[in-house]
Amino acid sequence: MRKIIAFLTIVIFASYAYGEFSLIKLGIDNNNTVLVTGGIQGDEPGGFMSANLLARGYEITSGSLYVVPNLNMPSIIKKSRGINGDMNRKFDTLSDKDPEKDIVEQIKSLVLQPNITMLINLHDGSGFYRPKYINKMMNPNRWGNIAIIDQATLPNAIYGDLEATANKVVKELNKHLLDPKHKYHLRNTHTAKGDKEMLKSLSYFAIKNGKAAYANEASKTLPVHERVYYHLIAVEEYLKLAGIGFKRKFELTPQGVKKALDEDLSVLVCGKFMFYSPKSRLGYIPLSNDGELEFDCDNALVALTKNKDEYNIHYGNKIVTRFTPEFFEYSNLINEIEIRIDEREPKFVILGQKISAKNSFEIIKRDGVRTNIIGYGTTPVDESGIKISKDMIKSRFSMDKDESIYRVEFYEETDSKDKFIGMILVEFVK
């Protein structure tokens, strides 16, 4: 789980042993681990959305895969190539005063782990690369739809025949083109011969340290789901060439990718909170009053930022919803509640779940716990023991755009201000 802690306007991203990005490990660790990264440049959603879908939509059946979808999350949030300069130009020499010094060192240490044998960086590039000039969008100065290597071979490295490997990937990509103009090419930057910019890149840092490294670029002229489609075809071929087995949870077509991305965006689970296709603006959300805001999110591209008196929930470089907080002391008094759905026998439900009802629901009374059905009443009284139908709740208090999902919150009753325990969502279905 990825923890996001916000102090006023400062947002700190943390996961595992790394302080600035999420490292997601799939499969079983071994000495042949492929590392896939996205988001080193925050204005390339095809790259970071692909890495995130790889982490969330694949099962590794043999071998080991590491995924970092959000190498530069602050820049992703701002839709910026780099809020502190281009991070992908900071892997040669870097001043100790650079604000990204620590994260760059963390990325370097990850790449240098002995088990990492291949690095794949996912990027979005302009236009469509062509070896010879065709027009302003298809020429040698464009970076879209290419596989990039720094040199043809890397002696003594596993997968050191960089050119041969990348050519196999290009060949596979070109079997699945959506349009002939999307044709992929191999681009060798011959970095060691004097490409001053590429000498500073993450890929070349890996090369200098004996690790096979590749970059895949998808054209920025394509919609994001088509970029992701091409990126994942490339990643799958690299994984096959590295002997990594996998199962995919969606169909690898533009439509299948778009559906998977939309589903991933529609359900955000963050600790005590759930957001299902949330409205662009929500009412009061109970947050901790201890001076620290904690969100334990299961999605590496979800972030929380504060803007004056509101909070924004980001998914990648989109703001999914905004909400106004109401501050409470938190309580862990219970972790489940009893509920009757559609007049059937009551059942226990773990907090943090979404349940469905056709006609009605009723929260069973529990001593010391106050139930608050958002949109039903106007005063802070216990609303358990009441059979609630959809027409009894004001639709403007719904969580979702379809006005079918409603919050039910639970509080520990105290002599002063009640403490927030948690919530469930109730969806009225037809």
PLM feature spans:
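Structured catalytic-domain cores with a bias toward divalent-metal coordination
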Residues: 2-6, 16-430
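Hydrophobic core
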Residues: 9-13
